[in-house]
Amino acid sequence: MSQSSRLSALPIFQASLSASQSPRYIFSSQNGTRIVFIQDNIIRWYNVLTDSLYHSLNFSRHLVLDDTFHVISSTSGDLLCLFNDNEIFVMEVPWGYSNVEDVSIQDAFQIFHYSIDEEEVGPKSSIKKVLFHPKSYRDSCIVVLKEDDTITMFDILNSQEKPIVLNKPNNSFGLDARVNDITDLEFSKDGLTLYCLNTTEGGDIFAFYPFLPSVLLLNEKDLNLILNKSLVMYESLDSTTDVIVKRNVIKQLQFVSKLHENWNSRFGKVDIQKEYRLAKVQGPFTINPFPGELYDYTATNIATILIDNGQNEIVCVSFDDGSLILLFKDLEMSMSWDVDNYVYNNSLVLIERVKLQREIKSLITLPEQLGKLYVISDNIIQQVNFMSWASTLSKCINESDLNPLAGLKFESKLEDIATIERIPNLAYINWNDQSNLALMSNKTLTFQNISSDMKPQSTAAETSISTEKSDTVGDGFKMSFTQPINEILILNDNFQKACISPCERIIPSADRQIPLKNEASENQLEIFTDISKEFLQRIVKAQTLGVSIHNRIHEQQFELTRQLQSTCKIISKDDDLRRKFEAQNKKWDAQLSRQSELMERFSKLSKKLSQIAESNKFKEKKISHGEMKWFKEIRNQILQFNSFVHSQKSLQQDLSYLKSELTRIEAETIKVDKKSQNEWDELRKMLEIDSKIIKECNEELLQVSQEFTTKTQ
């Protein structure tokens, strides 16, 4: 069986009979070792390193996932966001939990809900796109783009925090500083810049920088990088620099200095004041050179692709003619908070244009792969691989050497990955030390081995993964059920509710009175068709439940057989265990009897010692002449030893003084004549004699110390 077939056979990926009728999603995190699979309003989660069986949670009490919803995952993989045009649900994936059958526990995992109809007053604008802020602490910030081009930040873990709305209309006459016709959003890979793709004039790129959550997740390396960039920009200011630019750069340096002061090194986070979160849009970016033939087309999507393990990235924009342009930000822009229509160093350089000859639906990047972009079309997924030149470009940037770019060809490799209809997303799966790409639609799920395309992992990471795997392997008896019992109970509850609920289609009383055989029976046929569809859905649910119960019964029979076999093995070892137990009992009894004898002797000895201690005979007995002589000798030896110690200390001080004098004399007598050299030789001889004397004294002290030790024993 191939690697992809074994991976497809994992229980977590087994589809129900109604799976083709509902959308399915797959996500991964922590280098592809944590997997989340969604189908039939059930979240399944599975840790490759620690779990032997996947776990599941039904969220149908809160929403019914249909084709109107989109699902995204946070970078950490801890949160899922499900949204449509009117509502947003954020749910926590219960990593570490195995039993979440209780309703109150299930409700606790829905941590945020937003509804336009409930929250907004006045004109309502539908939701266009939602992103998790990649640098928010505990994934607590989501960014929402609406049809009216406003961008809202929600703190999903703090209900008291009011949402921050950017790019609002100013409701005044004259030029409006906001950006209209925003079709897509994307964060930079450092998480501090939000790119906006504007289609008013075909395809302009704007940016919010900095775009910050209420609590910013920042490590020391990134913090120092921001500070260094700010210092370089500040030092580059001169008399010709615009006043507005100077003000923004100075404010940026002050802001970054505050980040350093308030940074929590333990948790790697820093609180951001509201005034620094109200950034103003800047741009548009210049694209040099811009392909002339694209002036007649409109941009559709924007994405950022990491090209190394640092922060060097490529900005990719797709157009409705099937073109991709790959751009590089060649200048460092400054932060802007209070200046409208601000433009400074908003520059992008065109590196390559890729023509795909088909309509592009979406662009997807995987954090585990560098320099690769997945392009989703109607029924095909393609990979654009530009590592052939991106690695050289990254090296030139890091080493500040542009010479290798002279003969470099900027040509990306285009490869067809698979032909699948309606691909909502894809994920990277790390299973059995193999890298796999999971491609999913409502009807199919395929895996492709991409181990040869992956970036090399560090030895330490591999060691930690293998260690964790070995730690999780136990010798105990393990169940081999492929589906958790709570998931079967959920299917049963859904089926029971469907059985007792009436049909959604209500037959008018007038139609009920009409005989079935009549010339105008189209209405009756339509009613019967709708009712039959409802019953077919219930039949599918019943079949799904029946198949699950059937498989469970077979697995339980198999488990019963395994348990009986294990029980028989244990019973067969009973005689050997009894014999060993009797032998060990005899040894135990012998040790107990010996211990009791020793305890008896010890008690007798303690009684004698207590009698001696209490006896007046020993208390009144005088010390003998020999004992007094022995104690006096010990006292004399101690005094003599102490005097030797003091003498040795004095000699050591003399020696150190002589050494210091020797050093001083050596420094002063670099240029001496013959006579001085003779005197120096005599001094050295004297020092050697003194050194011998000191050595003899040390030997005598050592001998006396040994004699003293011998006498005192």
UniProtKB/Swiss-Prot annotation:
Its main location: nucleus. It is found in: Nucleus, Nuclear pore complex; Nucleus membrane. Residues 582-713 form a coiled coil. Residues 463-713 are annotated as: Interaction with NSP1 and NUP159. The keyword Coiled coil applies. It is a peripheral membrane protein. Keywords: Coiled coil, Membrane, mRNA transport, Nuclear pore complex, Nucleus, Protein transport, Translocation, Transport. GO terms for cellular component: cytosol; nuclear envelope; nuclear membrane; nuclear pore; nuclear pore cytoplasmic filaments; nuclear pore linkers; nucleus. One of its GO terms (biological process) is ribosomal large subunit export from nucleus. One of its GO terms (molecular function) is structural constituent of nuclear pore. Functions as a component of the nuclear pore complex (NPC). NPC components, collectively referred to as nucleoporins (NUPs), can play the role of both NPC structural components and of docking or interaction partners for transiently associated nuclear transport factors. It is specifically involved as part of the NUP82-NUP159-NSP1 subcomplex in nuclear mRNA and pre-ribosome export by acting as a linker tethering nucleoporins that are directly involved in nuclear transport to the NPC via its coiled-coil domain. This is Nucleoporin NUP82. It comes from Saccharomyces cerevisiae (strain ATCC 204508 / S288c) (Baker's yeast). The lineage of its organism: Eukaryota, Fungi, Dikarya, Ascomycota, Saccharomycotina. The gene is NUP82.
